[in-house]
Amino acid sequence: MSPPSATYDVVAAAATSVAKTNKPSTAHGSLTSTSTILDEFAGKWDDFSFGHIRESQVSRAMTRRYFEDLDTYAESDIVIVGAGSCGLSTAYVLGKARPDLKIAVIEASVSPGGGAWLGGQLFSAMVLRKPADRFLDDLGVPYEEEPSNPNMVVIKHAALFTSTLLSKVLSFPNIKLFNATCVEDLITRPAPAAGDGEGIRIAGVVTNWTLVTLHHDDHSCMDPNTINAPLVISTTGHDGPFGAFCAKRLVSMAAIEKLGGMRGLDMNSAEEAIVKNTREVTKGLIIGGMELSEIDGWHRMGPIFSAMMLSGVRAAEVALEVFEERKRECADKK
């Protein structure tokens, strides 16, 4: 289960602290003696009761909305594969920039957020390098300057960043998160380049419940569903059970020759390489975040999150640059 959306009451730093704390201007509520919610309920529990419901009404309230979403987003404008720190950052920027676009976010896990609920080695704090602090300012996430290095800032708990970003993404009316849903394949169309009769473009994704995907090897055939979209943004992370999926699929469908393979950890070179090389790798498919390290052979970045955020910003920028052209191509050849 994902952690709930976090609130944060700014407190004065201890006298021994030399770190400067960034304090967002937004106010945060807390349960105090003057809280409206306590005024509403405190001391009245003997007379408390919930309104009466019927179980089928609960079922219908859930299923009706979900199937309406499936119908609405069967034709999407943009699909984002992977709701980690990079994918959610992409969704946030796109949601703000283009509220007219239908954006589907597909996440294999029950809990979106990827590895961004904690820092390195299951520690709480999240470390990032400037100028990624500007993204935190835009989100309204508080952070501290790091006394040991003026180029670094620290969020007191990674979950504070992820819950804030996730809550903002989910508040956009044009974005739908389908979690516990796996992308099993890519929808393709022929797109021959000059002198090349075998080129392809990506035209959407093939989906299934994650629990179904995990059992294809021990159950009979369970066919998938589909979402058409002129542009797919893949941010599935480095190689793993579901990681680097689109990158690996491009190799198996002969769209690219081979993967570069992620190199050993080097934060300084890895972060800049990931941000600067976030791009459309084939028509209709943008790849960002650590998935790029598998395609290009960049270094691993480890427990630092600046590039994840700004690669998401860059992926959104690339999407805005190419979207209208990809949309026209899909309209021309359905």
UniProtKB/Swiss-Prot annotation:
Keyword terms: Cytoplasm, Iron, Metal-binding, NAD, Nucleus, Thiamine biosynthesis, Transferase
Biological-process GO terms, alphabetical: thiamine biosynthetic process; thiazole biosynthetic process
Catalysed transformations (reactions): [ADP-thiazole synthase]-L-cysteine + glycine + NAD(+) = [ADP-thiazole synthase]-dehydroalanine + ADP-5-ethyl-4-methylthiazole-2-carboxylate + nicotinamide + 3 H2O + 2 H(+)
Co-factor remark: Binds 1 Fe cation per subunit.
SUPFAM superfamilies reported in the protein's UniProt record: FAD/NAD(P)-binding domain
Annotated InterPro entries: FAD/NAD-bd_sf, Sti35, Thi4_fam
GO MF: cysteine-dependent adenosine diphosphate thiazole synthase activity; iron ion binding
GO CC annotation: cytosol; nucleus
Record localization: Cytoplasm; Nucleus
PANTHER family found in the cross-reference section: THIAMINE THIAZOLE SYNTHASE
Protein name, as recorded: Thiamine thiazole synthase
Species name: Ajellomyces capsulatus (strain G186AR / H82 / ATCC MYA-2454 / RMSCC 2432) (Darling's disease fungus)
